[in-house]
Amino acid sequence: MSTIWFDLDGTLYDLYNQPSWLEMLNNENGKVYSCGNSLVEVSEFSLIVTELKKQGYKFGVITWLSRNCSRKYGNSIRYHKLKWLNKTFPNLFDVVHIVKYGTDKSKFVTSENDILFDDDENVCEQWENSGHKCYRLLDSRNSLGVRLMNETAIFYTLAKYSESVLQASE
């Protein structure tokens, strides 16, 4: 069965709407990756993911470290991203890859039907060039309307996957 992958920053995690986020990044303060909010309604998202997992889907996260970060800062980022994931979505994701900035995320594809949700156009292009579907989310900085559109797109797409599995089993 396929894996449904999510980026974190700007996709599930609201990095860019935190006060002083850029200053925290520049000061290599890893807490910037654990003190923000979710960009999706947590209980609804968790319910949908749990139902799809019952149908055999796996769920994963592929997220980058900060650009040109030191080993020490990279370890802090990993710690804080995992802290946020475990607090916000406990035991929801089957696999989490926190990798060097710019890593080709399509290297983590596990089946021909894997999909990715990401807000980075270049990431989606690489993913699609590898023969897989990427749902590109819009930049949600300073826009509640765009955040709501992205959340709706995620929920709608996951619901479609759920329906296709149910129809195939009939």
Regions found by a protein language model. Name each.
Residues V61-T63, L116, R136:
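Structural beta-sheet core signal
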Residues Y13-Y16, F59, R67-K72, D104-F108, ...:
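Short catalytic/ligand-binding loop motif for oxyanion handling, primarily in non-cytosolic enzymes
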Residues T63-R67, V95-D104, D139:
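Acidic carboxylate-rich catalytic motifs and surrounding loops in phosphoryl-/glycosyl-chemistry enzymes
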Residues D120-E170:
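Asp-based, Mg2+/Mn2+-dependent phosphohydrolase catalytic module
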Residues H97-W127:
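Conserved Lys-Pro-Asp/Glu-containing loop-to-beta segment of HAD-superfamily phosphomonoesterases
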Residues L92, E112, S130-G131:
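Short, structured coil segments at secondary-structure junctions
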Residues S2, D94, D114:
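Conserved acidic residues
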Residues T3-W5, D9-W84:
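Alpha-helical substrate-recognition element adjacent to the catalytic core
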